[in-house]
Every structure is written in C-alpha cells, then in structure tokens.
Amino acid sequence: MTTPAPLTGLLPLNPEQLARLQAATTDLTPEQLAWVSGYFWGVLNPRSGAVAVTPAPEGKMPGVTLISASQTGNARRVAEALRDDLLAANLNVTLVNAGDYKFKQIASEKLLVIVTSTQGEGEPPEEAVALHKFLFSKKALKLENTAFAVFSLGDTSYEFFCQSGKDFDSKLAELGGERLLDRVDADVEYQAAASEWRARVVDVLKSRAPVAAPSQSVATGAVNDIHTSPYTKDAPLTATLSVNQKITGRNSEKDVRHIEIDLGDSGLRYQPGDALGVWYQNDPALVKELVELLWLKGDEPVTVDGKTLPLAEALEWHFELTVNTANIVENYATLTRSESLLPLVGDKAQLQHYAATTPIVDMVRFSPAQLDAQALIGLLRPLTPRLYSIASAQAEVESEVHITVGVVRYDIEGRARAGGASSFLAGRVEEEGEVRVFIEHNDNFRLPANPQTPVIMIGPGTGIAPFRAFMQQRAADGAEGKNWLFFGNPHFTEDFLYQVEWQRYVKEGVLNRIDLAWSRDQKEKIYVQDKLREQGAELWRWINDGAHIYVCGDARCMAVDVEKALLEVIAEFGAMDIESADEYLSELRVERRYQRDVY
C-alpha cells in the first residue's frame, strides 16, 4: 500500500525527513506505532511527568486496534468517541481509517474493534471495500488469537440493513475470531445504542487487560485530527443561500439546481471531494396535511429531547417525514390495528416494498386512524441532514460553497410529493435566506498529491458535482496532469450540466478528453459504462501511466455497471482473467488510485 500524501504545508518536516520517517515506520504493527508515538511524546515532554508507553510485557494483552469504516461520517464519530473512552480508561488504542489499514496483518491482531456503516445494496463503505474483499477472499488468514467486536450503523429504510457489519462480524467469527460482544446494529438514531455499546466495550476490555501506562493513540486517517472547525453536524453554520439556478433545460424530465451558499467570514474550509451537510425544514404544507389526516390541530404539546414543543414545530424541524421505513409501517399497523396494513406485519419483503412506494403521509391517508400527538412522534425517526458532494474549490470561489441538487418530485395518486432537502433548497429557501450547513470531510475522495498525475473522472447526472470542484482546483494549481471526463444524462440539449464550463476547460487545454453518453438521444440507450468499453485501449494506457480513477453518483446501478466495465477493460487490455482484473482493481483501490463517492 502506498502512504497517502501528507499535508506537507502543515508539517514541520522537510520532504527528506518525512520520507525517512515513513520508511522507518512502514512495517510497524499498530501496537508498535502506538509505542513509538508515546515514546516520542515522552521525549518531548520530560518535565511534564508523562510516561512513555512501553511495549506490553510478554504474555500480556497488547493494545486495541480500532478500525473506522465510514461513509457519511457517523461511524467515524462513534469510533473517535470510543477511542477517547478507551484512552480515558488508560487502555492503549490505535484508531485507523479502514482505507489506511494494512489488512494483511489482521491475523496478528489480538484485540480488534470495527465500527462500520453500510452503503448501496449492502456493500461496505468505500474505505472498507479492500478490507472486506480480502477477508472474503481465499487469501484471508485464520484468526487464532483475535478477539473482536463490531458496531454496525445502518438505516432500516433500506433492505440490506447493517449488512456490512453483519458481514464483518460473521466472517471474523468464521475465520476463528472470538467475539468480545455480540454485534450491535444501530438505526439512524444511533446515539443511545452507540453510547451503551461503547461503555460495554470499555468494561469488557478493562476486565481482560492489565491497566496500562498512560497511552497515546495513533489516529491514522482520523480526519478530526486534521480538520478542525467550530461548525459541525451538531453545531452547524447558519449561512446564506445566494444563488439557486436551474441548470437543466425547459423540456428536461429532471430539475437540477446549481446552488451557491455564502459562508461569509466563518472561516469554514473544505477540499475538493468533501461533502456539504444541509439541515432542512420539512414543508409546512406537508406537516399540515399529516396533522389534519390524524384529526390533530398542530398546537398539541409534545416532548422532544426533553423539551416541550408544539406538534407542528416538532414535525417541521425535528422529524423525518419524507422517507418511510418498514419499521414505521409495522408500528403504525400494530398501533392502529389497520385492516389494510396488518397483513403486512411479519413479511419483511412486503413491508420494505410498501415503505419504498408509500410516503408516510399517504400511508396515513390510505389507512386512516386517530393518534394522539405524542404517539405520532413516537412513530417517527429524527430528522437527519442530507449530504451533497461539493461542486466547487475554494481556490476559485473563496468563501462560497457550491452544490448540485437533483430535485426529487413525484406523484402519489395525483398528489405531488417531493424530497425533503432538495425541495427545501430548490423552492422553500429564498435567495439571501438562511440555511444551516457543515462540512463532512472525505479523505477517501481526494485529488492526487502529484499535480502531474493523470485523472479519470466518471460522473453521470449529479455525479458530475465533485469533478467541477476537481477541475477548478487543477486549473487554479496549474496542474500539468491530464484530465479525462466521462459524463452522461438523458439528453444533450436538455441535460448537459455545466456545459459551458466543460467547453471552456477543453478550449483552454485543462480538460484533455471528454466522453459523453446521452441515453435517450438515439434508439439504443448509451451509458457511461458503454463509453468506458468503447475507449478501453486508451483507458488502459492512462491507467498504465498512473492515472487515478474517480467515480461519483448512484451506488445501486451506475457504480456497479461502471466497475464491471472497468474490470472488462482491465481484463481485455491487460491480458488477465476477470479474477486477476478484480485483484488489480483492488490494488488500485488500496493505492488510492480508484476512489468512489457513491450514494
């Protein structure tokens, strides 16, 4: 595995010193890295009374390796909180990003804790794909002396709830690992479950381990050690929406908005590849409709996180109304004894299908009942922010942040419905209106550190967003590396997002190649994966020249089809079978040369 490029501008080492340090630590285990960290900290603080961490005596249990496998940041936050808990308990812990973990050393781990989310159709988060593939391959080693625990985050509105955590848990046990604790599967409202689990992990590890000397953690890839800001998911910045521009044509079936948000003098910083978290307000009209369907008024007092609020206010600001789940359907059916819904109870597939096709308000319309206000609140999930890939680079836009928003709109039996965050941004926040935002850093979707490295960008639809940021950054840096964009959408005349900008980059020689797939402009549908196969020989040449490959967009179909096409290109032009091509692509992923931001 190659070492991720450091933020050299922030380091007090020159390149030669940094290279020597990296060479000296390449083959160290997490326990050895933790000891080295503590040793140097002690050297620098001889008068503070600090005690350098010493290796565990023979026969004693070594430190804990804590792997964070995060897609939207929640798993990372849980892992960081557990790290702090373990350090407070005087236990030696190494926190490592799954993308940085040297997974071939897993058989030497004594204590292993994994905190993971799930994406797409039950796949692991991007940073954990290589580890997942290794564990499920023939190369996986027996875990003869490894004790482990898994905390899994998911969303019950998806069919493959917490599947990644289930996979890690079952495979580690199958390979011979000993469970420290039973796996915990947490829904969107994960905080209470995580807090309880963290306490149990600390207790069980304290009971197994001798008390260690005060220790230092090695947080490889833990972005909170690099990115600091007073504005977070729980304490967002109140910014100003300055531009809301429709960038699809009048006759397009899609409504895509270019949104610009003014960060003012907040000092909020981001990098190309990061996401913008947006807290939104539910549509007051939707709240009114739901309240009236339940024969309520909206002024009924309800308790939310220990505070008393009017029902309508609670529904607007604190609860998810636009995404139904199987659990909500089942609980509503049981609570109301609905004759139409009770037959679904116990049938997971039918519950999932009903939830996916019937919004909460229409479930209530089709199966009316009378609930008191607090019972309604008890059915619902807390509102969560939506994440949008950032479509700008601060090297060009400075104190602004841009996003590309596909507005979700559809009808249910003639009644207009819309996505919560997208309709909020597109239609309910006026220009110069307030919007609460934060940056979700993504160090697993970064431009190459070397500006001469070629870049291949694959982003159909709104997946184009981060590549606009990439090109702004490459242009501002004067990067000499070649750039190749694959983009697709239904129609050239209606759906060519940011067309003028791409044409300008081509004219200026910044964008060296652009391949476009218009799926509805001819009888035969053409997608970006077809363009990849069409350009297979040249694509393979770029890969051999060290190109980094980036994919952004839909995880369910597009990302799967694109990866299949890449494997076929690698197999054909690299003279490999598909299994070898898969190993090759996995190695590119480990080297950070194949990165995806899919959702």
Curated annotation (Swiss-Prot):
NADP(+) binds at S519, R520, K525, I526, Y527, V528, Q529, D561. It comes from Salmonella paratyphi A (strain ATCC 9150 / SARB42). The keyword NADP applies. Binds 1 FAD per subunit. Residues 234-448 form the FAD-binding FR-type domain. Belongs to the NADPH-dependent sulphite reductase flavoprotein subunit CysJ family. In the N-terminal section; belongs to the flavodoxin family. FMN binds at residues 70-75, 117-120, 153-162. PROSITE patterns: FAD_FR (PS51384), FLAVODOXIN_LIKE (PS50902). Keywords: Amino-acid biosynthesis, Cysteine biosynthesis, Electron transport, FAD, Flavoprotein, FMN, NADP, Oxidoreductase, Transport. Pathway: Sulfur metabolism; hydrogen sulfide biosynthesis; hydrogen sulfide from sulfite (NADPH route): step 1/1. Its EC number is 1.8.1.2. This is Sulfite reductase [NADPH] flavoprotein alpha-component.
